[in-house]
Amino acid sequence: MGYTNSPLVAYTKLSPNHSGQRTHSIDRITPHCVVGQLSAESICGCFISTERQASCNYGIGTDGRVSLCVEEKNRSWCTSSRENDQRAITIECASDKSEPYAMNSKVYASLISLCVDICQRNGKKKLLWFGDKNKTLNYTPAADEMVLSVHRWFANKSCPGAWLYSRLGDLAKQVTEKLGGSTTVESTPEVTTDGNDKTIWNFLKGKGLNDFAIAGIMGNIYAESGFKPTNL
């Protein structure tokens, strides 16, 4: 099938920073935190200079509007991994500037809608989140499956931040439900209270841990233990 771009796009400013047409079919989605409450236009603007050596396929501004920075047919430079970017649609999402890099409800709702659209146009009925790097990277998706991956697996970063990382199970669940599919993969528990996220973060920070270490701990708590902040 030919490559298309999302009809949800409200603004287009194409970046010169890409590798041309993909060498792998699209079977991953990689959401990122852009580290700033930026507009859809500003996210594209971040990737216009060739000196930046970075880009993404889509941006989601702080008001929930979607921008197109690199067409889906082309590999963006977003995840510090050639292999991942060749097969992933990369999405930079407006966020706070510091951990847990929280995103507002408009951004999250648009991320869900954009993921649904990407899956539909690429013939996918399920969006999967395993919460495990090795399992994800060694998994061969079925023809109707799309898989979530994250930037932190390929670089010394916390991206997409503890806020979104803890919600990727919920993202996969909501998208799959809207696609009419089903999944047996366990979802990461949804974290519903931002204040509790920050309480845990500040507690661990007070123990002398750095931001990257705290992000990893919080992600593991939510993804693997089944706990929610309200239970801790």
What function would you assign to each model-found segment?
Residues M1-D85, T188, N196-G206:
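N-terminal catalytic cores of peptidoglycan-degrading enzymes
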Residues D211-L232:
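Catalytic glycan-binding domains that act on GlcNAc-containing polysaccharides
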Residues P31-G36, I60-D63, C69-K73, E92-D96, ...:
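Active-site-proximal beta-strand/loop segments in catalytic clefts of secreted hydrolases
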